[in-house]
Amino acid sequence: MMLLQLNNVSVGTRLASFSSQVTTGLQIHLIGPNGAGKSTLLASLAGLLPASGEIVLAGKSLQHYEGHELARQRAYLSQQQSALSLMPVFQYLSLYQPAGANSQAVATAISYICNKLRLTDKLPRMLSHLSGGEWQRVRLAAVFLQVWPDINPDSKLLLLDEPYSGLDVAQKVALDALLVEFCRSGRSVIISGHDLNHTLQQADEVWLLAQGQVLVQGETQQVMRADVLSQVFEVDFQIHNFNKQQWITTRSV
């Protein structure tokens, strides 16, 4: 089922015109060197950065959504955001609960998401007292809550700009599990990141960007090829098969 359509979308000189489409249940990864345009693309998909062309979410152009309607359809995690110091975690999360959601269902969702992200003991803590990794997980919990299927049946899309930043190995695994669960509910996720092996293992589709252009897009195995990646990143990559999985390495000098 079609979820998102991009028709000749561009953002000034920061993102060249391209077209694409996203169906339901997919995890799509945006990869490319720093400055490639990944954050620009995500912000435009979120409706927060004006773009030329047309972005259609759930059959309706982003330009025709009211703010409160768009907030029910998608959630967006920016790459950086300062913590609001005079606020405990539980109050911050409450700002993201969908309008009209059942209070008990919201409490259950908060408990579930925070347990998965290992945040339960942080709920009463002030945001200013969180470490960088804790704050990142709180931000993730908030955007998950905004579009969590049990309390927001209208939700369609989660947009995450470098969500794994600041997370340790166990926390990354926990985030992976939540993303898989979210996609299995018929929603889709678009993620930017720099861990090529993580993308190789987790993504259903990959969009490869460089210098403000979407150069290649398609199924993961089609895009994550050593020759394609080497040309874009200007690094000599190799792909190895080990234990029934593929792994990307750089070639030794």
From Swiss-Prot:
Gene3D superfamilies: P-loop containing nucleotide triphosphate hydrolases. Its main location: membrane. This is Vitamin B12 import ATP-binding protein BtuD. It comes from the Bacteria. It is a peripheral membrane protein. One of its GO terms (cellular component) is ATP-binding cassette (ABC) transporter complex. The gene is btuD. Part of the ABC transporter complex BtuCDF involved in vitamin B12 import. Responsible for energy coupling to the transport system. GO terms for molecular function: ABC-type vitamin B12 transporter activity; ATP binding; ATP hydrolysis activity; ATPase-coupled transmembrane transporter activity. It is found in: Cell inner membrane. The lineage of its organism: Bacteria, Pseudomonadati, Pseudomonadota, Gammaproteobacteria, Enterobacterales. The keyword Nucleotide-binding applies. ATP binds at residues 32-39.
